[in-house]
């Protein structure tokens, strides 16, 4: 059974579970800064709170500042830190992950390393372990992450909601659809660095439609559209997520993103249309 920390690590409720078989720290970026801190080092220190004495930790590729914090925390607890390396990334790529996105190869490599560490000492044949890992990576699904809801007209949804996530999405779109431009539909929380998120998307954008997600923390769609227009890109706000399917353009690609709240609403619209 796998438990995911909801926020940070040091004060997260998952710490009440006792000692796991393995702890895993994925790539650290700027998010929840009002709680976790304003620098990568501060955020990494909070994430390092899941590292426990006697429990090995797997660490995904990190910025050097974050990696140094995590390795010091592991050393202080006297545990081994298995850092995902380039050869792990290449092995994961060869397994053909079922999830779209260049960043999913990194996630797959991290999951592969975590499984190997968790099974260390277990009576599992090496070849069987390889088969199970390969099958899991190939069959993995992740609703709301580069998920294609419609192929014609094309609509992809992605729950990326911070600048790191948007950058990963942009890189993946450039790899999957080189030289293409996109219509973006965007809804964000007001406490996110949405200006940096917009900046990541501008080079790939034909235009934007903005919405106000159903959350007390939501940024008003018109405010977001106004900020985008200041960058010289067409943008207008709509009041209902249910309008989005009617806005799609044949033979062109639309990407909806910016908030898991918004993506959840849009997925519900499509499920109700089925």
Q: What positions do the PLM features span?
A:
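Short amphipathic alpha-helical segments
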Residues: 12-16, 36-38, 70-71, 168-170, ...
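C-terminal helical cap/extension that packs against the catalytic core
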Residues: 60-84, 154-155, 163, 198-253
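Flexible active-site lid/hinge loop adjacent to a nucleotide/diphosphate
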Residues: 1-61
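A glycine-rich beta-strand to alpha-helix segment
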Residues: 243-271
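Nucleotide phosphate-binding/pyrophosphate-handling subdomain across enzymes
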Residues: 8-24, 28-29, 42, 92-207
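Generic C-terminal helix-cap and adjacent flexible tail
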Residues: 121-124, 268-274
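Flexible, gly/pro- and Lys/Arg-enriched active-site loops
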Residues: 28-34, 144, 209-227, 270-274
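Structural motif
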Residues: 60-62, 159-160, 186-189, 213, ...
């Amino acid at each position: 059974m796998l438990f995911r920390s909801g926020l940070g690590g040091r004060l997260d409720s998952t710490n009440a579970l006792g000692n796991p078989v393995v702890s895993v720290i994925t790539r650290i970026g700027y998010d929840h800064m009002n709680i976790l801190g304003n620098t990568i080092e501060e955020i990494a220190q909070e994430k390092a709170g899941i590292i426990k004495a006697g429990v090995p930790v797997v660490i995904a590729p990190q910025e050097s500042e974050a990696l140094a914090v995590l390795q010091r925390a592991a050393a202080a607890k006297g545990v081994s830190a298995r850092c995902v390396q380039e050869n792990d990334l290449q092995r994961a790529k060869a397994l053909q992950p079922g999830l779209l996105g260049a960043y999913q190869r990194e996630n797959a490599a991290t999951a592969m390393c975590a499984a190997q560490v968790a099974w260390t000492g277990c009576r599992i044949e090496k070849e069987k372990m390889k088969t199970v890992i390969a099958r899991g990576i190939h069959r993995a699904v992740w609703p709301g992450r580069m998920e294609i809801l419609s192929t014609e007209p094309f609509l992809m949804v992605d729950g990326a909601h911070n600048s790191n996530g948007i950058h990963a999405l942009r890189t993946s779109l450039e790899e999957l659809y080189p030289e293409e431009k996109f219509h973006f539909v965007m809804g964000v929380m007001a406490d996110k660095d949405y200006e940096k998120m917009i900046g990541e998307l501008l080079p790939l954008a034909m235009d934007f439609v903005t919405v106000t997600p159903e959350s007390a923390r939501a940024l008003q769609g018109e405010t977001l559209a106004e900020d985008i227009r200041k960058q010289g890109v067409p943008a207008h706000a709509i009041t209902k997520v249910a309008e989005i399917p009617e806005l799609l353009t044949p033979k062109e690609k639309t990407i909806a993103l910016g908030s898991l709240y918004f993506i959840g609403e849009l997925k519900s619209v499509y499920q109700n249309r089925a």
